[in-house]
């Protein structure tokens, strides 16, 4: 089976978040099911530099007014199609925003062009290659399904994965005539969205199957509280929605061989983890208070609940703990954490930005990973934390509630607990969770059991890749049934 995976980012070539990790690791997991994936990505500078065996397969004289080349290539074990369009993707800023953090004004055009070419690949643009299924990820790629639908080609099943419904690709309606779609596409059954254009909404309407990244999130997004204005569409399509929890790449995230960390260890030899704690403290210039090291490797945003953490950080300091923050996001929150570091230089350290190697070292050295998200479709940080023996402290929402077993008395007695959940998701809820963490940390035997149980958890793609394989088979063989079984 051949799959065309359409994604705006893919690890290890280019990454801003969990989308890249999933897009990079799922194809590897699907190989065990006899499924070959070619991933189609924009030709950002980081992508172009990494390519090997690059061969031009199609030329575009005027793709939304710009010259472009479609390239077939390989990189880091991934089979790729790359849209080399310097006018769209060779930018000085980040993937979606400029150096000042503002969305590129032509994002609508950048990803409409990308989606249009994806639909053409699905229809046979590349000689001697055509997919059995097109699988688009998030709003950047969602329009590929709509272009394919309005091309009149219903022979290729269309799958859309929504990694976060909050990111929708919404643009002014006056761009619609430039999209190259028929007039009827600007309708409630197409891209029209509250008087604007909705790229994600258009993809949701055109998809044969919609996956989201956990069964809990699949249920949550049917409600106004989590539907982000799309709950009506999601309810209309509920029979075609399936929740599949993300996995992680166990080769990239393996504490027994990770080149990013100094001291290797595993669930069988967990004591070898201890020196990584001192390495981490030295890196951040912090003394060892002998209390737990709390960490957060996250976007500094309201969605991620980082304002709750900023408001409760004093609880960590008061109880003799240490807090390490690594991430970037809203200026107000960045400033709040920098202020906390100035106030408590012996207990709090903050690193604004994102560095993949440092993220690995933090997971290997910290005692507890804080994930206080107000909503979280799946989350990967808590899975990395489990794998690395860093106890997750998570809000009870979305995929967090499915992947972490709370350390209540019954779960601890049964030796199945893997972390700490909290609700309600507010300052008091998080503060209570921090106090629970301190209490458990002081019970050394209990804490080490919690850590070991987490490390034994299967965070791989094994089960989830099988679910995707079943979904693909169902779409090609309609007598089967998986969709709607969230």
Swiss-Prot record:
Q: What is its EC number?
A: 2.4.1.21
Concerning HAMAP family, the annotation shows:
Glycogen_synth (MF_00484)
Role, per record: Synthesizes alpha-1,4-glucan chains using ADP-glucose.
NCBIfam families xrefs: glgA, PRK00654.1-2
Q: Does the keyword Lipid metabolism apply?
A: no
One annotated GO molecular function: alpha-1,4-glucan glucosyltransferase (ADP-glucose donor) activity
Tell me yes or no: is Ligase among this UniProt entry's keywords: no
Q: Which GO terms describe its biological process?
A: glycogen biosynthetic process
Q: Which PANTHER family match?
A: ALPHA AMYLASE DOMAIN-CONTAINING PROTEIN, GRANULE-BOUND STARCH SYNTHASE 1, CHLOROPLASTIC/AMYLOPLASTIC
- This protein's pathway: Glycan biosynthesis; glycogen biosynthesis
Per its UniProt record, what Gene3D superfamilies does this chain match? Glycogen Phosphorylase B
What GO cellular component entries does it have?
A: cytosol
Of which family is this protein a member?
A: Belongs to the glycosyltransferase 1 family. Bacterial/plant glycogen synthase subfamily.
Q: Which reaction does it catalyse?
A: [(1->4)-alpha-D-glucosyl](n) + ADP-alpha-D-glucose = [(1->4)-alpha-D-glucosyl](n+1) + ADP + H(+)
Write the protein's name.
Glycogen synthase 2
Which keywords belong to this entry? Glycogen biosynthesis, Glycosyltransferase, Plasmid, Transferase
**One Pfam family matching this protein:** Glycos_transf_1
Q: Locate the residues binding ADP-alpha-D-glucose.
A: 15
Quote the gene name from the UniProt entry.
glgA2
């Amino acid at each position: 089976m051949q799959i065309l995976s359409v994604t705006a980012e893919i690890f290890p070539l280019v990454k801003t978040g969990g989308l890249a990790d999933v897009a990079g690791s799922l194809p590897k997991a699907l190989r065990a099911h006899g499924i070959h994936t070619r991933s189609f990505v924009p030709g950002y500078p980081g992508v172009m530099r990494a390519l090997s065996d690059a061969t031009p397969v199609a030329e575009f004289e005027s793709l939304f007014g710009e010259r472009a080349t479609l390239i077939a290539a390989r990189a880091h074990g991934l089979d790729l199609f790359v849209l080399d369009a310097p006018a769209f993707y060779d930018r000085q800023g980040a993937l979606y925003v400029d150096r000042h953090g503002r969305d590129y004004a032509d994002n609508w055009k950048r990803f409409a062009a990308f989606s249009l070419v994806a639909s053409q690949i699905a229809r046979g643009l590349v000689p001697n290659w055509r997919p059995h299924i097109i699988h688009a990820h998030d709003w950047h790629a969602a329009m590929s399904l709509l272009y394919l639908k309005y091309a009149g080609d219903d022979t290729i099943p269309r799958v859309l994965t929504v990694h976060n419904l909050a990111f929708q690709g919404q643009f002014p309606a006056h761009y619609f005539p430039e999209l190259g779609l028929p007039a009827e596409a600007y309708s409630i059954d197409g891209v029209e969205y509250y008087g604007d254009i909705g790229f994600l909404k258009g993809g949701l309407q055109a998809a044969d199957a919609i996956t989201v990244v956990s069964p809990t999130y699949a249920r949550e997004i049917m409600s106004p509280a989590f539907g982000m204005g799309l709950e009506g569409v999601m309810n209309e399509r509920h029979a075609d929605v399936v929740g599949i929890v993300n996995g992680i790449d166990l080769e990239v995230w393996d504490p027994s061989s990770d080149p990013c960390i100094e001291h290797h260890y595993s669930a069988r030899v967990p004591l070898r983890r201890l020196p990584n704690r001192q390495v981490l403290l030295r890196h951040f210039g912090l003394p060892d208070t002998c209390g737990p090291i709390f960490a957060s490797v996250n976007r500094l945003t309201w969605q991620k609940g980082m304002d709750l953490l900023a408001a409760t950080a004093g609880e960590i300091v008061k109880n003799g703990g240490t807090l390490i923050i690594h991430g970037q996001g809203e200026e107000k929150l960045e400033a709040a954490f920098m202020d906390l570091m100035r106030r408590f230089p012996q207990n709090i350290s903050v690193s604004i930005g994102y560095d993949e190697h440092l993220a690995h070292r933090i997971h290997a050295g910290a005692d507890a990973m804080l994930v206080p998200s107000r909503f979280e479709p799946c989350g990967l940080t808590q899975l990395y934390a489990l794998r690395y023996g860093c106890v997750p402290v998570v809000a009870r929402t979305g995929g967090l509630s499915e992947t972490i077993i709370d350390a209540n008395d019954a779960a601890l007695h049964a030796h199945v607990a893997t972390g700490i959940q909290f609700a309600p998701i507010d300052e008091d809820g998080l503060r209570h969770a921090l106090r629970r963490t301190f209490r458990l940390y002081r019970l050394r035997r209990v804490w080490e059991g919690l850590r070991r149980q987490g490390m034994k958890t299967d965070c791989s793609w094994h089960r989830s890749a099988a679910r995707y394989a079943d979904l693909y088979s169902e779409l090609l063989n309609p007598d089967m049934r998986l969709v709607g079984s969230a």
